[in-house]
Regions:
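A charge-rich, low-complexity, intrinsically flexible signal that marks solvent-exposed coils, linkers
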Residues: 1-116
Length: 116
């Protein structure tokens, strides 16, 4: 099983989006999360750094500037999705990636506080 560290730059970026009210409170994450084609299209016009910012986890041992490096996406490359954060908490918890789970949980709590 892969091991992950928290993408601190991603956490900061997502928190900033929440503070700017760039979020979706009610969505179907299965439909909203970026497909492989949408990820490729995003990378055609954005840097790897910008792509990485949408992910809360970094895969240990994976090369930088590869899709394999970045895990636990929480937005659609435009807005953070509450359901994306919930999915991240759930997946990280299920696979015992505690630090990623806690980072996602804190962001979810922040989103709930900001959104009232």
């Amino acid at each position: 099983m892969a091991s992950y560290t928290v993408n601190k730059a991603g956490v900061t970026f997502v928190r900033g989006l929440i503070d700017k009210k760039r979020y979706v409170l009610d969505s179907d994450w299965g439909d909203a999360q970026p497909s492989a084609d949408e990820q490729n299209a995003y990378l055609d016009t954005h840097s790897w750094k910008e792509y990485a910012a949408w992910h809360l986890g970094l895969t240990e041992g994976a090369n930088d500037e590869t899709k394999a490096r970045y895990a636990f996406v929480v937005g659609d490359f435009s807005r953070v999705h509450r359901t994306g954060l919930i999915a991240c908490v759930y997946r990280a918890s299920e696979w015992r990636h505690k630090e990623v789970e806690l980072a996602a949980h804190k962001l979810l709590q922040h989103l709930d506080k900001v959104s009232g």
